[in-house]
A protein has these predicted regions:
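Acidic-enriched, low-complexity/disordered segments with a strong bias for Aspartate over Glutamate
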Residues: 6, 17, 41-43, 84, ...
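Membrane-interface "cap" regions at the ends of multi-pass membrane proteins
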Residues: 2-9
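Glycine/small-residue-rich interface belts in oligomeric ring/scaffold proteins
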Residues: 10-77
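Internal, conserved structured core segments that host functional sites
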Residues: 62, 67, 74-146
Length: 147
């Protein structure tokens, strides 16, 4: 049995928990689809999820996490901020754009109030340099995972 476990492993598990307490959640349009009766049963819910995962999530969310991680590993804060700006400008739905920004700012706020041993200063540099911008959740997450 291990007596000493790296605390950062638990933090990584915690931030990947769907119930991570960032005090904000969002349906990302599912509510509207239900209200308009476009998602009304198991089959239409499956199609909605499949479409969302194979388009928006894959080419926007996952790609931005990957790019933020890569830029952070190269200490390229300007590149990270550029990804945030591109994401903010490319989300056509105001509702989804604001959700991403709120999730990002609350994610950052929660992490800053947590005692974390970072392996580098990339996340804290990103937070300081993105104060005048609107950080997105996926970019903040990617930079945090690299840090």
């Amino acid at each position: 049995m291990y007596n000493c476990v790296d605390k950062n492993i638990f933090i990584l598990f915690q931030i990947n928990d769907a119930l991570f307490p960032i005090a904000y959640s969002h349906s990302y349009g599912l509510e509207t689809y239900i209200q308009k009766n476009l998602v009304r049963d198991v089959d239409s819910a499956y199609e909605y999820l499949k479409s969302n995962l194979m388009s928006n999530f894959l080419y926007s969310e996952l790609l931005s996490i990957y790019l933020a991680y890569e830029y952070a590993s190269r200490n390229n804060t300007k590149g990270i901020i550029k990804i945030d700006n591109i994401l903010n400008n490319s989300k056509s739905s105001r509702e989804v754009r604001i959700a991403s920004q709120k999730l990002g700012s609350r994610f950052i706020k929660t992490l800053l109030s947590t005692e974390i041993n970072y392996k580098n200063n990339n996340f804290l540099d990103y937070v300081n340099k993105s104060k005048n911008n609107l950080p997105t959740h996926t970019v903040a997450y990617g930079v945090f995972c690299q840090s």
